[in-house]
UniProtKB/Swiss-Prot annotation:
GO terms for cellular component: cytoplasm. It comes from Prochlorococcus marinus (strain MIT 9211). S-adenosyl-L-methionine binds at L64, G93, L112, S113, P114, L115, T116, F117. This is Ribosomal RNA large subunit methyltransferase H. GO terms for molecular function: rRNA (pseudouridine-N3-)-methyltransferase activity. It comes from the Bacteria. Its main location: cytoplasm.
Amino acid sequence: MLNPSRYRILAIGKTRKAWIQNGLNLYIKRLPGLTITELKDSDLKKEAQSIRSSIKTNELLIILTEEGESLTSLGFANRLKSLGSSRLLFVIGSANGLDSEIKAMANWSISLSPLTFPHEIARLLLIEQLYRAKNICEGGSYHRN
């Protein structure tokens, strides 16, 4: 079973749109223990420094990038399940992306879609997929094949 209290989302910039924040709040309630931390947006080097200082030594670094691995929802759920009790840190960069140093540090790089989304929406998509993955692993009815 997936344990959201072992997951953190680190995002550059603020969530400014109320409807996105409402969606995030809905899934945060469904995923007790999951936290989202927002870091100030800046230039890539300063953002990389903020990200590096936020990574805990026992966390696997998972970044969201255009170049990342593309998965189905079932594939994502199975991959998370295979990581077992690992602590996971999902990082969503700013509109400028992520510094190459952070990309090189990543344990796993994923892409939510070949389409480009505002970074606020990427947060909502990620948290929804985390909820969906948890539901898939628990045999719930949220995900339909």
